[in-house]
Amino acid sequence: LGMYFFYVTMRARFFHLFLFFAFLAAAIFVGPHISDAQERIEEKVGKLLVKEFDPEKLTVQATGGGSFLYAKATGIVIKGVRIESVSLYAMMKEPPNNIKEDDEDHKYKLADLIHYSRGEVVLLEKDFTEYTSKEIEDIKGFKNLECDFSKNGIRVSGSYVATFLFTFNIRMEVLSKLAFDERGLCLTDTTLLVAGVKQPEYLTSQLLERINPLIERERIPFPVRITRIDFSDDRIVITGNPQPLKDANVWNYKRP
């Protein structure tokens, strides 16, 4: 149960991360409406992203007409979790004239105008560990959370404390990988251990059924391509290999 609530919490964080993608993609079409004011598209998009997410660093590229966009934000915090970097390459459709910036739903309407995109998210182990140690003190009895990244995936462990007639203090551990498939972003190749003993497959399957997908593909408000998920000792890279634009206008920002 403790592991379930932990992963439900993280599912919400991943969802807000993909909403960042949506805002980033939507922002490009705010630019053309003010082109007559001589503020370039990439500058307008960049300023919107800085205002919304306060990144440590940001690079935005855009073609002259705004049909193609590349943006990379470094050091953003989403729901308490620091994300090392988020990148997006997008090919856009023509914006309808009736969408306005002050429309409450403009972010999501504009996200629908993405024809094709590639995204990338880089999450560092040190940032995830800091989040679990400081922000998640107690999730339904789950204490002393520890997280470890490796080439084999993610290991999350901790003590589950519950009281029923008397107090239980059980060491629990989950070893898992991530996959992006037709359902969305999911945990896969998962092993559940309680007090060091591997649990039956049906228990692990029940846990995964309640957790997966972390992000439903249908809830991502625009088409984004993710081709692989790479694990190392210090980071996870969820990527569709977005590449910077060539011969495009560039706007750079660094937090003071």
Show the residue positions of the predicted features:
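N-terminal Sec-pathway targeting helices
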Residues: 9-19
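Extracellular/lumenal and peripheral-membrane lipid-interaction modules
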Residues: 30-256
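Hydrophobic alpha-helical segments of integral membrane proteins
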Residues: 6, 26-31
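Bacterial N-terminal signal peptides
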Residues: 18-27
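Short, Lys/Arg-enriched N-terminal segments with co-localized hydrophobic residues
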Residues: 1-9
